[in-house]
């Protein structure tokens, strides 16, 4: 089962918004929010809440790809999230999330008995490539014990 399939099966908002997983690696995840009139805002583009969910979901996908092998001993949790809306979004938008620290450094902190935190940067773009939003989600790996 792919990360996209797993998240679609376990996170209802992924199914609700029909998010599409275009690429998922331990360094980067790319998701798309299809253009759907039921999730438009007052100016006919994707609602800010839908774009936030897209960005947070992309960040979660890269976290799972990078740290999926640690799930037996730690649970990934979003700590903070900040988004800046830059331009009007229209049509399908994509979110590209990139891990902000080397995964090995994060795992080393976990190995030391600490609860590591790390940023994931997200860029949201229209189909023409224009950046419509930028987001940072800080994640932690909370040890299970």
Task: Tell me the role of every PLM-derived stretch.
Residues 14-15, 134:
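N-terminal intrinsically disordered, cationic/polar leader segments
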Residues 89-90, 100-145:
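HotDog/MaoC-like acyl-thioester-processing domains
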Residues 15-19, 79-85, 105-107:
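Short structured motifs
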Residues 16-46:
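Catalytic strand-loop segment that frames the active site of acyl-thioester-processing enzymes
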Residues 34, 38-61, 72:
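Hot-dog-fold acyl-thioester-processing enzymes
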Residues 16, 26, 46, 76-80, ...:
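Short connector loops at helix/strand junctions that flank enzyme active sites
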Residues 1-12:
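Extreme N-terminal tail/first-helix region
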Residues 62-101:
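Hydrophobic beta-strand-centered segment that forms part of the acyl-chain substrate-binding groove
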């Amino acid at each position: 089962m792919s990360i996209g399939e797993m998240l679609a099966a376990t996170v209802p908002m992924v199914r609700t918004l029909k998010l599409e997983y275009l690429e998922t690696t331990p360094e980067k995840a790319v998701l798309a929010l299809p253009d759907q009139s039921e999730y438009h805002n007052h100016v006919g583009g994707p609602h800010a809440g839908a774009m936030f969910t897209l960005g947070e979901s992309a960040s979660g996908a890269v976290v799972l790809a990078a740290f999926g092998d640690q799930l037996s001993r730690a649970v990934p949790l979003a700590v903070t999230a900040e988004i800046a809306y830059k331009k009007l979004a229209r049509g399908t938008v994509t979110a590209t999330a990139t891990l902000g620290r080397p995964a090995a450094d994060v795992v080393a902190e976990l190995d030391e008995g600490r609860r590591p935190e790390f940023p994931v940067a997200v860029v949201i773009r229209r189909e023409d490539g224009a950046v419509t939003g930028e987001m940072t989600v800080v994640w932690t790996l909370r040890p299970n014990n």
